[in-house]
Design a protein with these regions (language model features):
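Class I S-adenosyl-L-methionine
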Residues: 343-391
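Flexible, glycine-/basic-rich loop-and-beta segments that form/coincide
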Residues: 90, 378-416
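S-adenosyl-L-methionine
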Residues: 1-43, 53-61, 75-77, 84, ...
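Short conserved loop adjoining the S-adenosyl-L-methionine
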Residues: 240-247
């Protein structure tokens, strides 16, 4: 199956936890539980549908799909893209030509009268000139042109497809039209992905997203697919839906609960506002400093869909209740080693339900546009596969444990290392560019070009769990803990050939950039001065990075001035 086809890759909202990048792994998990191959009509349950990409995969596989999400925007999007087949368009809109004409009509509407403008009034600047906006006094979630586009299209949808008209055709026309607008509104937004904050100026400091942000909002023809089986979408709490007993048993249930503290109702409040279109006033009141009191103007009713999975004290119990309530032969769970519920607890809860297997993938964690001086930037997203008709086997759980441990060790090989720390935990063989350590009576040898980066061994899967744990601990204790430590290591290595000096100097700008945040301001200027002083000792090599260092400095000044 081609996972990059339009239905599985287009018109999918940008989303924290969006499973588009994990879709090959989820597809593999589905194939693993179907040893006789995919067959039409398999009952598939997706209670945390979100962007809907996994349910789209299930529909594409010709499964019977029951999807659910209690956020209004997700419910509308998934109802449109799951419940409507491509072949339904002529019966809903009379013809494909009529739908294209409707989209042309939406895209060429005049601006709404001032009293009917909502997004343009509260969530966008008063001027079309992006260089004259003031993020302190007005919200900058959209350009004025795109805010006006949202207003006029959304107002027109309510006018020609009134919400109180409950006929099938009217509701389907309405849902698909709103879904197309929601995708555009989620895409052409002046944010890093969520609506809790907007960039201070369009495109942020780097201006690297201006093309996306400034591109005009226009509704495109929907990417739909065909299925011979029904796809139904609910809007409910996942556990409540599973516990009602109204749903028959499923062949496969796919669970993707929230991993972290980010609540979807607050993160995507503007999408809910556009979906509901209740136009709750969001006054632009200023405080005594002349700055907006309520910068994001988040809907107060977001707490109605507040998820227990986003709280450390509640997440584990919520997950356990859900797993116990699900009636399915196979349960596929995607979660993260960086999630609120520790991996061991997730594994144990799953093992109480049945036999457990695992698939893993390295996945960059969500950082909301910022990097940390000291945090690792990689974690492991994994998929656990539960066979609820078998009891958990010790050997299966041992494989699960080892798989995660191997991945954790491999991720450490992506870090940079302190040569001094390495010498405390390994024997350094400088003549042969390697480090060695005796682990479980065997001498382990790891290649390293410079004692700053390490090459993973090709035999890592053959190590015992005990050996992996010891290796993990030694590598963890030897790794650079901060970007400052990395910069120091780089500078300590600037004593080799011209080629080597050039190689290390080129690492400096991106490493220095990680310190260009207010909380590291003092450290940034200390290291900036040290970096600039390198020009005196290495003038020709420094010329290779001079412009990049200046760009980092300029970016830092912009951040610090705000």
């Amino acid at each position: 199956m081609e996972l990059r086809e339009p239905y599985l890759s287009s018109q999918i909202i940008a989303y924290i936890g969006n499973k588009r990048g994990l879709l090959p792994l989820i597809h593999e998990a589905i194939l693993n539980v179907l040893p006789n191959g995919v067959r039409p009509g398999i009952r598939f349950f997706d209670p945390f549908a979100g962007s809907g990409v996994v349910s789209r995969l299930a529909k594409k596989l010709n499964f019977e799909v029951i999807a659910n999400d209690w956020e209004e925007y997700s419910f509308i999007i998934n109802t449109a893209y799951l419940s409507i087949n491509k072949s339904d368009i002529p019966s809903i809109f009379e013809s494909e030509r009529r739908l294209k004409d409707l989209l042309y009509h939406f895209n060429n509407l005049p601006d709404s009268h001032e009293e009917e403008q909502y997004i343009a009034k509260y969530y966008a600047p008063s001027t079309v000139d992006i260089d004259k906006v003031d993020f302190r006094k007005e919200r900058l979630f959209y350009t004025r042109q795109n805010a006006l586009a949202i207003d006029k299209i959304r107002n027109e949808i309510d006018r020609i497809f009134p919400p109180k008209k409950k006929t099938y055709v009217n509701q389907r026309r309405r849902q698909l039209s709103i879904a197309l607008l929601l995708y555009e509104a989620a895409t052409h937004t002046n944010t890093s992905g969520v609506f809790k904050a907007y960039h201070k100026g369009f495109g942020g400091h780097n201006k690297d997203a201006l093309t996306r942000i400034l591109a005009p909002i226009k509704l495109r023809y929907p990417c739909l697919c065909e299925s011979n089986y029904p796809c139904v979408v609910y809007k409910d709490d996942a556990t409540d839906l599973a516990q009602y007993g109204l749903l028959d048993e499923f062949d496969i249930a796919y669970l993707d609960p929230p991993y972290n503290q980010h609540q979807y109702g607050s993160n995507y409040h503007l999408l809910n506002t556009i979906a509901v279109w209740d136009k709750i006033p969001a006054p632009l009141e200023l405080n005594e400093k002349g700055v907006l009191r309520d910068k994001a103007a988040i809907r107060k009713d977001w707490i109605e869909t507040r998820s227990d999975y986003c709280y450390k004290v509640k997440a584990e119990a919520a997950f356990k209740d859900l797993i116990e309530s699900i009636r399915a032969h196979y349960i596929i769970v995607s979660y993260s080693t960086d999630g609120i519920i520790p991996f061991e607890d997730v594994k144990d809860i799953c093992a109480d339900k049945g036999d457990v297997n695992i698939l893993t993938n390295e996945y960059v964690k969500y950082r909301g546009g910022k990097q940390s001086n000291g945090r690792s930037n990689l974690n492991i997203e994994y998929v656990l596969i539960i066979d609820s008709e078998k009891k958990a086997l010790k050997q299966s759980l041992a494989v699960v444990d080892k798989t995660i441990l191997v991945k954790k060790v491999l991720i450490l090989f992506k870090k940079r290392y302190s040569e001094l720390k390495l010498s405390n935990h390994f024997d350094l063989v400088e003549s042969d560019n390697r480090i060695e350590r005796v682990i479980q009576d065997k001498r382990m040898k790891l290649a390293t070009p410079d004692f700053f980066e390490l090459n993973p061994p090709d035999y890592i899967d053959e190590l015992s769990i005990r050996a992996l744990k010891e290796l993990y601990n030694c590598l963890s204790l030897s790794a650079c803990e901060t970007k400052e430590e990395e910069l120091q290591e780089i500078m300590d290595k600037l004593d080799g050939s011209r080629e080597k000096v050039d190689e290390y100097l080129k690492l400096i700008p991106n490493t220095l950039r990680k310190l260009a945040h207010k909380k590291y301001k003092d450290a940034f200027f200390t290291w900036l001065e040290r970096v600039k002083n390198l020009e005196e000792g290495y003038p020709e090599s420094y010329a290779l990075i001079d412009s990049k260092v200046r760009a980092v400095e300029e970016q830092a000044y912009k951040r610090f001035s705000n």
